[in-house]
Amino acid sequence: MVNVPTAVWIDERGRIVRPNEVAFIDDRFKTFTGMDSAPYIDAIRDWAAKGAKSVYALSEAELKARLKPRSDERSRADAEFALAEYLYKQGKGADAIPHFKEAQRLDPDNWNYKRQAWALSDAERDYGTSFGKEVKKLNGKPYYEPRKLPAAVARP
């Protein structure tokens, strides 16, 4: 998951029917992201009403095509991040920083790693950056991957 708010749709059988994607339920971030919340809300309502027959519920083949394989770097990043969190919770914040940095290096697109680390210390001092600076570095690249929803379904 890139950042909050994201969601994974899981049906009553425990099966994932949509992978993680940005999940705005209102338009408070529309000027920042350019994403309208209405199509996503309509999709949720359609799925809630129609279940597996909803055009928004993905088949197993569609789901597999969208899921990204887990790389060795991502697995190592998860381990580094977990170690950093552990050290921080043990009162060893300074010892955690190199592990937070390594997690970010190994999985540079993971904003969860960045934002968590920056919130636990002085981001400018310890990481030489801030959330605002990193967003500016995107230089127009979407912060959130655009949703892949089918064309709007006519309302009854």
Language-model features: where?
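Short coil turns that delineate tetratricopeptide repeat
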Residues: 74, 106-108
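Thiol-/selenol-based redox modules, centered on thioredoxin-like
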Residues: 3-92, 121
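Alpha-helical linker/edge segments of TPR/alpha-solenoid repeat scaffolds
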Residues: 120-149
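Long, low-complexity intrinsically disordered regions enriched in Ser/Thr, Asp/Glu, Pro/Gly
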Residues: 122, 153-156
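Boundary/linker segments of alpha-helical solenoid repeat arrays
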Residues: 31, 108-116, 128
